[in-house]
Structures are given as structure tokens and as C-alpha cells.
């Protein structure tokens, strides 16, 4: 494994551990010790997707899990994963899961709740 691949793996691990807080590419680059441009280029090269897309998709997967496994309000889940409004969250969630959060919850909510 190259040094660059190790750096990206370390960054992915750090991102996954910090998805509960706002993550800006500038901050991630600073944390990694790279320029924003260089980090984004490396990430795309090794992961095959942009850094921003990776973060957004990970947050959406966690939000989907919360919709499925908890009774938290959609608005609270939206805020928990750093979306600036419920409207934005609903639009992005619908684009990813082909249904709005409320419908996703009704269809997938755990039997335990």
C-alpha cells in the first residue's frame, strides 16, 4: 500500500469517526496536512468518488439507519448529520433513496419500535 493510500485510509477512518459533527473539506485537509486541492485529487484517485460525495453518502446512510432504528424526529436527524435545513435533507435523501425520509421510515422502521 502506498503512502497516499494509507493517508486516504486514515482520513476515511477519521471522517467516519466524526460524521456526527460538521465536516468541511478545508478542515479535513488541514487535519491531514494537505492542501484542499491535493486532498480532493488524492481522494478521488484512491476512492473513485469525490470527498464531498463520500461524506454526504455516509451521513445519509447513518440518517437512514436512524430513521429505521429510532423514533427520532426527521428534523432532529437532519440536524444531527449537519444538514442546513429539513428541506435540503429531504431533497438529498429522496434523490439517494428514491423516497422522502418519512416514507422510508414507514417502509423500513424496525419492528422493535
From Swiss-Prot:
Q: Signal sequence: where? A: none
InterPro entries on file: Homeodomain-like_sf, HTH_AraC, HTH_AraC-typ_CS, MarA-like, Tscrpt_reg_AraC-type_HTH
Q: What induces it?
A: Part of a putative romA-ramA operon.
Task: Please tell me, according to the UniProt entry, what happens when changing residue 31 to D.
Answer: Transcriptional activation activity declines significantly on either acrA or micF gene promoters
The answer on whether this UniProt entry bears the keyword Ubl conjugation reads no
PROSITE patterns cross-referenced by the UniProt entry? HTH_ARAC_FAMILY_1, HTH_ARAC_FAMILY_2
Q: Which residues bind DNA?
A: 26-47, 74-97
**Pfam families linked to this entry:** HTH_18 (PF12833)
One term of GO molecular function: DNA-binding transcription factor activity
Keywords for this entry? DNA-binding, Transcription, Transcription regulation
Effect of inactivating the gene: Deletion in clinical multidrug-resistant isolate KP22 increases sensitivity to many antibiotics, including tigecycline, doxycycline, minocycline, piperacillin-tazobactam, ceftazidime and levofloxacin.
Q: Where is the HTH araC/xylS-type domain?
A: 9-107
Miscellaneous remark of the record: Overexpression of ramA in various clinical isolates confers multidrug resistance.
NCBIfam families of this UniProt entry? ramA_TF
- Assembly, per entry: Monomer. Interacts with the C-terminus of RNAP subunit RpoA when part of class I or class II promoter complexes. Also interacts with sigma-70/RpoD in class II promoter complexes.
What's its job? Transcriptional regulator. Binds to regulatory regions of target genes, including its own gene, efflux pump operon acrAB, antisense RNA gene micF, and various genes involved in lipid A biosynthesis, including lpxO and lpxL-2. Regulates expression of many genes, perhaps including its own; activates various lipid A biosynthetic genes, and as a result of activating acrAB, confers multidrug resistance. Plays a role in virulence and survival in host cells.
Its recorded name reads Transcriptional regulator RamA
Organism the protein comes from: Klebsiella pneumoniae subsp. pneumoniae (strain HS11286)
Amino acid at each position: 500500500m502506498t503512502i497516499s493510500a494509507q493517508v486516504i485510509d486514515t482520513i476515511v477512518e477519521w471522517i467516519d469517526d466524526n460524521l456526527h459533527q460538521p465536516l468541511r473539506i478545508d478542515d479535513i485537509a488541514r487535519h491531514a496536512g494537505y492542501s484542499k486541492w491535493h486532498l480532493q485529487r488524492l481522494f478521488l484517485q484512491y476512492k473513485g468518488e469525490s470527498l464531498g460525495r463520500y461524506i454526504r453518502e455516509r451521513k445519509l446512510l447513518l440518517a437512514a439507519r436512524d430513521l429505521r432504528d429510532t423514533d427520532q424526529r426527521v428534523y432532529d436527524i437532519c440536524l444531527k448529520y449537519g444538514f442546513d435545513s429539513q428541506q435540503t435533507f429531504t431533497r438529498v435523501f429522496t434523490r439517494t433513496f428514491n423516497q422522502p425520509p418519512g416514507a422510508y421510515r414507514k417502509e423500513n422502521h424496525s419492528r422493535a419500535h
